[in-house]
């Protein structure tokens, strides 16, 4: 069994952050966590599908690197979607959580991509 098929999977639980929020931004009742995701996909078709999936959750910052700002439930759904798209024997996706402190200390040089920001909507 691979990790994304495990129904009891606790992927979003981090032993270093028992609260699981990495000092997260709060949007409504859901804390939003930032992740950097990079991939090395052998097959062109699979690579395109992975890029489209990640593009629906965040912003491309380099050819095979994305930043996403998602809640735990969305992160779990995204990981399951990505897992279904790759060949676990030849492809690799790495997901790095970014705590609020680390993200605030980030330095970008050259052409940069705006950090994804989710602001609450006010409907009148």
Swiss-Prot record:
GO biological process: defense response to virus; maintenance of CRISPR repeat elements
Gene Ontology MF terms in the entry: metal ion binding; RNA endonuclease activity
Keyword Nuclease: yes
Cofactors, names only: Mg(2+)
Entry-linked InterPro entries: CRISPR_associated_Cas2, Virulence_VapD/CRISPR_Cas2
Keywords: Antiviral defense, Endonuclease, Hydrolase, Magnesium, Metal-binding, Nuclease
Binding site for Mg(2+): 40
Enzyme class at the top of the EC tree: hydrolase
Catalytic activity, EC: 3.1.-.-
Recorded family membership: Belongs to the CRISPR-associated endoribonuclease Cas2 protein family.
NCBIfam families the record matches: cas2
Subunit comment: Homodimer, forms a heterotetramer with a Cas1 homodimer.
Summary of the function given for this chain in its UniProt record: CRISPR (clustered regularly interspaced short palindromic repeat), is an adaptive immune system that provides protection against mobile genetic elements (viruses, transposable elements and conjugative plasmids). CRISPR clusters contain sequences complementary to antecedent mobile elements and target invading nucleic acids. CRISPR clusters are transcribed and processed into CRISPR RNA (crRNA). Functions as a ssRNA-specific endoribonuclease. Involved in the integration of spacer DNA into the CRISPR cassette.
The name this protein goes by in its record: CRISPR-associated endoribonuclease Cas2 4
Species whose genome carries this gene: Rhodospirillum rubrum (strain ATCC 11170 / ATH 1.1.1 / DSM 467 / LMG 4362 / NCIMB 8255 / S1)
Gene name for this UniProt entry: cas2-4
